[in-house]
Amino acid sequence: MHVKKGDKVQVITGKDKGKQGVILVAFPKQNRVIVEGVNIVKKHSKPSQLNPQGGIITKEAPIHVSNVMVLDPKTGEPTRVGFKVEDGKKVRIAKKSGELLDK
């Protein structure tokens, strides 16, 4: 998967197209990510011990990883991700600027 938790991304398709946010959780097996402030859904919850009130809760739902692009650290524009071996380690680079994405 070309994105990781903590990456700044932009949504490129769907109802939230153009929105930017940080990846909160990544699910590599399902190829899905949860992006902060994107794909907000309303969830109805029964009263429980954790939430005695119950009611409607708004939270982020996962979106497919193909619908997001990493933002270039240099320019702030969406960019594709490339891989390169440096000092025996595989690192991610931004295709537009060649900047390293992994610190």
From Swiss-Prot:
SMART domains named among the record's database cross-references: KOW (SM00739)
Cited SUPFAM superfamilies: Translation proteins SH3-like domain (SSF50104)
UniProt entry tagged with the keyword Ribosomal protein: yes
Gene Ontology cellular component annotations, sorted alphabetically: ribonucleoprotein complex; ribosome
CDD domains: KOW_RPL26
Keywords attached to this entry: Ribonucleoprotein, Ribosomal protein, RNA-binding, rRNA-binding
Gene Ontology MF: a single term: structural constituent of ribosome
Gene3D superfamilies linked: 2.30.30.30
InterPro entries, per database record: KOW, Rib_uL2_dom2, Ribosomal_uL24, Ribosomal_uL24_CS, Ribosomal_uL24_KOW, Translation_prot_SH3-like_sf
One GO BP: translation
Subunit structure, as described in the record: Part of the 50S ribosomal subunit.
NCBIfam families tied to this protein: rplX_bact
Functional description taken from the UniProt entry: One of two assembly initiator proteins, it binds directly to the 5'-end of the 23S rRNA, where it nucleates assembly of the 50S subunit. One of the proteins that surrounds the polypeptide exit tunnel on the outside of the subunit.
Recorded family membership: Belongs to the universal ribosomal protein uL24 family.
UniProt name for this protein: Large ribosomal subunit protein uL24
Organism: Bacillus mycoides (strain KBAB4) (Bacillus weihenstephanensis)
